[in-house]
Amino acid sequence: MNAPIRSDQLSAMTAAPTLPAFVHLRVRSAYSLLQGALPIPQLAKLAVANRFAAIALTDQNNLFGALEFSNKLADAGVQPIAGLTLTVDFRDTLEDPAHANLKGADAKTVISGDIALLAMSEEGYANLMKLGTEVFFDPALNEAPHIAVDRLEQHSAGLIALTGGADGPIARALIEDRRAVAEARLDRLVEIFPDRLYVEIQRHRMREERETEAALIQLAYAKDMPLVATNDCHFATPSDYEAHDALMCIAGGNYVVEDDRRQLSPEHCLKSADEMLALFADLPEAIANTVEIARRCHYRPLGRAPILPRFVSTGDGASAKDQLKAEAEELARQAREGLKARLEAHG
């Protein structure tokens, strides 16, 4: 398995002319209901126009678009990376008195935060499907979809994890001035994803990102964890921001003129590789690790013909033609019996 890239490995990687400079690992399509505004056909066209070698789809709590994404991007000559953004509950929201004092009666409703998972292999994609289902089973009544960290551990094989941006569990704990909890959460993720965990850095010009970035980098370096640069893409271009903001208001039941509501920024768009290189010029290893992650993800979901049940047993040695003939005869028999029963009942 390839190890995460460190600063001292950068020169060898950047010298290879065949490697892309940057890979988007956090993209939400229109299948992120009331969050994303990128139809997958448009995403495929944008990937080609921007000459992306690979791109990941990480919709919120679902894989609705995974197969369409895989087929469209592969047909366009772009490597599709199957992923998922999951809300994870570390079950620690009441263990720290500082958090209870901060949130009061609302402490129980605070879920730890979002992480991104990327499928490295067929086993990893199978685990993504399990997690995408169970995320709706763990929550209690009236709670938002999320998954317990112990459940995440049960289905972690074959997956790469990114720690999330300002909405991630590590950054959220730092925003609440709970550094010990942030460290404990990071340590727990390291246990679950050894050699497959990256500390995520995002720069959308959001206050929460500015307040937590230095601490996140410090934590990563202190624990010898690799960094990765991402842009949480919700829409295509900055000009789409206002329309997307209205979409978020619909999702939250708010008005655009309200200030006290969840808002993104025009920076949550699908930026070019050059824009990302300029944005993270001071953290080249975080950019290089996007390419390394793409290289570690070598599986994509494939379509298959419908698998229909067999209505008649013809034995192990029967040919497909014999099976079809037997099923046709069985259908005719049941139709005749049904017709006879109706005629007898109604005269």
What is the predicted role of each segment?
Residues 1-347:
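Phosphodiester-processing cores and adjacent nucleic acid-binding clamps
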